[in-house]
């Protein structure tokens, strides 16, 4: 997968190109990234990419023309993929959406806004989808872009061990269960005994019940979604009836 990023701060992306799973996957050729600074296509001495908003108000707005010129260069270089921008008013990013993008096998272009935002005319004519990573405001689109890239790369076959995907939050429709490692006792707290016995059937049962319990307590909406998608077993439903308040079906 090829990902092109339009950003005023290309150096920020070293965090994902030089470290961790994303770096290793990049070195193995599973994905590639190109960073494009719209200042490089400006024609004035100040390399201007922003201006005051019409109608007044605080801050500056990123101009449409430098972004359009940068996108034209990306298209000419061979990336014809979907264009994504980032803003709190966008569609909430979900694991399901990430998996859809990976399954499509298509390239992506990510536009990272700054200041008060991007001229709406560019968004209307050239951006296919605006994504939000939560109900809060950041200084720019670079951090959301890196969040999305990390989530995407993890789903590319070969990026991480296959079994890791199976146990991650959302892969089964539920949140992940708690994890423990050595020592067995830390600050007088023991690892749950079931994890020390080596009985894999019991461990699997405990893990599933922990996932159910955590999901019910923190994301009950996911229980309803998993039920609607047929991801809850009869054993799951029995545990829910016995251990939680009645849930709507």
Regions found by a protein language model. Give the residues of each.
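Hydrophobic/aromatic beta-strand patches that form the interior of the parallel beta-sheet core
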Residues: 4-6, 34-36, 82-84, 108-109, ...
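Structured adenosyl-cofactor binding patch, chiefly the S-adenosyl-L-methionine
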Residues: 118, 122-169
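Short, structured active-site "lid" loops
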Residues: 49-70
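SAM-dependent methyltransferases
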Residues: 1, 183-249
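Short, surface-exposed acidic-centric catalytic microdomains
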Residues: 35-56
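Glycine-rich, flexible N-terminal cofactor/catalytic loop recognition
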Residues: 1-40
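S-adenosyl-L-methionine/SAH cofactor-binding core of RNA-modifying enzymes
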Residues: 63-114, 120, 157
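Internal, active-site/partner-interface "lid" segment
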Residues: 143, 155-194
């Amino acid at each position: 997968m090829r990902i092109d990023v339009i950003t005023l701060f290309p150096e920020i992306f070293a965090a994902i190109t030089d470290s961790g799973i994303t770096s290793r996957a990049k070195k193995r050729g599973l994905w590639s990234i190109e960073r494009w600074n719209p200042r490089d296509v400006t024609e004035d001495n100040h390399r201007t990419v922003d201006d005051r908003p019409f109608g007044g108000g605080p801050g500056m707005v990123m101009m449409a023309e430098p972004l359009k010129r940068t996108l034209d260069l990306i298209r000419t270089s061979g990336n014809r993929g979907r264009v994504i921008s980032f803003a709190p008013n966008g569609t909430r990013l979900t694991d399901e959406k990430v998996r859809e993008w990976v399954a499509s096998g298509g390239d992506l272009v990510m536009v990272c806004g700054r200041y008060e935002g991007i001229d709406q005319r560019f968004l209307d004519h050239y951006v296919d989808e605006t994504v939000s990573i939560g109900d809060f405001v950041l200084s720019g689109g670079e951090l959301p872009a890196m969040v999305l890239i990390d989530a995407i790369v993890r789903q590319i076959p070969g990026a991480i061990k296959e079994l890791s995907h199976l146990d991650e939050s959302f892969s089964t429709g539920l949140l992940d269960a708690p994890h423990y490692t050595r020592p067995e006792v830390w600050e007088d707290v023991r690892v749950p005994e079931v994890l020390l016995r080596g009985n894999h059937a019991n461990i699997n049962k405990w893990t599933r019940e922990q996932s159910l319990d955590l999901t019910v307590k923190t994301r009950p909406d996911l229980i309803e979604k998993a039920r609607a998608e047929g991801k809850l077993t009869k054993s799951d439903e029995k545990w829910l009836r016995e251990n939680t308040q009645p849930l709507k079906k």
